[in-house]
Amino acid sequence: MRRLLFATLLFPVAAAAQDHSMHDMPAQPAPAPQEAPVDHSMHDMPAQPAPAPQEAAMDHSMHDMAAMPGMGANAVGGSGSALLPAAEGAMRGFHATTTGNWMLMAHGVLTGVYTDQGGPRGDDMAVVQSMAMLSASRPIAEYARIEFRAMLSLEPAMGRRGYPNLFATGETANGRPLVDRQHPHDLFMELSARADVDIAPGTSLFLYGGPVAEPALGPSAFMHRRSARYLPLSPIGHHWFDSTHITYGVVTAGAKTDAFQFEGSAFKGREPDEARWNIDTPRLDSWSVRATWTPSPHWTAQISHGRLKEPEVQHPGEDEARTTASLHYARGGLSAMLGFSAKNRLPGDTLTAWVGEANWDLSRHHSLFGRIENVANDELFPDHADPLHDRLFRITRFEAGYAHRIPLGKAAELALGGSLAAYAKPAALDAAYGKAPISGTLFARLALGQ
């Protein structure tokens, strides 16, 4: 009963909760010399005294970030409250443990990209993609934990129109729909908090959210999936699967066991506006539910459904019912995902999309990766005077590439690589896109802790 009550009062009592962390256990005295056996086991080494408070020493190390609170043995945290197979390995980052039992973590990615998108509607451009993530977590009781997280990007500097990405659509720039382009991420990608309370062995409740967060809808966002680690451009099905990964206003409550997670969210349905440097007004006008199954450290499956209030500014008055399902696999150096999504415009048509992607680390220095997408899209011709306006076309995109990885000590990695993309499309699009457009992309990716 005490734990259930604690779960409902978690945030107000956090500051006053007693910390039963192992870090605060007194050091055990070493055995007397005459009794000490000749044993070099690590278990029998005398405990080191804690640093004096006045030293305020910080333990800096590079290692896997501990799984997010309550993840269990079979899963690690993806974006938001999404789960990924534990065999993918937790996110790596720079850690500092303070004397107050706070675990601080920093992670970042900076990618220089040059892409040449083929065909008459293609374009070429050099851009810099970026993401920096900071988190602070600690136990607040013997059976409760709390985490604060911030994620930032300087991509708004590339301009409102983002970068060329053939057959990608979604959002607007300067009042016009973006077509064959990917919009930049906002400066504030996440400003959130999460609290977990254990209510029974292997079972916990959690509360997650913030002014910028991700609701329980869809798989983990593409930039957080190991299967998409070296793919230089966003999926053209981004607005089917994970466009809600930057949402202004999210509250999620859930329950987690070793094998299952069930959660529900209230959030703002409208996608971010064109002003990428600020924080949009949060609102809770939409909802979603998600169930995730983690039967082993190698498999994760999720199914989710949400009702979004007017998500796209170019479709005023249209709500959306979105349903997604995905299966994730990881073993050794292989990470893969297969996903399906259906977005039903209310009123309007139901548009479906499929995605399959994989990354295979052949060795310490060599990786192969690829993605296949099939998307039904009716936004390729936004001009009302165009005879193809509002026509539905099903596009298949094939992309494959190679990355050469250069470890930079334990702290960072530089990856140099590139990819080629080809497309299958209806003949009615030949005049606009050419018969067989080919796109090529080169990248240099510097990652802190990954």
Predicted feature residues:
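N-terminal periplasmic/intermembrane-space "pro-region" immediately following the signal or transit peptide
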Residues: 17-107, 111, 122-123, 135-143, ...
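Residues that define the transmembrane beta-barrel architecture of outer-membrane proteins
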Residues: 102, 124-132, 185-191, 245-251, ...
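Repeated loop/turn-to-beta-strand initiation elements of outer-membrane beta-barrel proteins
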Residues: 104, 142-146, 201-205, 259-263, ...
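Transmembrane beta-strands of outer-membrane beta-barrel pores
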Residues: 110-118, 152-158, 211-215, 257-259, ...
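Residue-level signature of outer-membrane beta-barrel architecture
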Residues: 136-139, 197-199, 254-257, 293-295, ...
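Surface-exposed coil loops of outer-membrane beta-barrel proteins
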Residues: 159-292
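Outer-membrane beta-barrel "beta-signal"
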Residues: 400, 406, 434-450
